[in-house]
Swiss-Prot record:
Disulfide bonds: 38-73, 40-66, 56-74
Similarity section: Belongs to the sea anemone type 3 (BDS) potassium channel toxin family.
Keyword Signal recorded: yes
Name under which the protein is recorded: Kappa-actitoxin-Avd4j
The organism of origin for this protein: Anemonia viridis
Keywords for the protein's UniProt record, in alphabetical order: Cleavage on pair of basic residues, Disulfide bond, Hypotensive agent, Ion channel impairing toxin, Nematocyst, Neurotoxin, Potassium channel impairing toxin, Secreted, Signal, Toxin, Voltage-gated potassium channel impairing toxin
Subcellular location: Secreted; Nematocyst
Length: 82
């Protein structure tokens, strides 16, 4: 077998091993929600900013919103811990 081909095979195997190890660490890492906070005029609460959406998504308990074109800020904030 060619030395260069053998070296490429070793490097590929090492990359697969390190990638698999990194995935195992990611499974045990705590999940953090990455939603951005937004504020609408006249509201004191924080809302959830949805980027490039025309309306608030269903299933999150949103009851009101305001537009900050091209994004939308949805209320009430349905996730705790912020």
């Amino acid at each position: 077998m060619n030395k260069a081909l053998f070296l490429c095979l070793v490097v590929l195997c090492a990359a697969v091993v390190f990638a698999a190890e990194d995935l195992q660490k990611a499974k045990h890492a705590p999940f953090k929600r990455g939603a951005q906070v937004c504020f609408c005029p006249g509201k004191v609460d924080r809302g959830d900013l949805w980027i490039l959406r025309g309306d608030c998504p269903g299933g999150y308990g949103y009851t009101s919103n305001c537009y900050t074109w091209p994004n939308i800020c949805c209320y009430p904030q349905s996730f705790s811990g912020r």
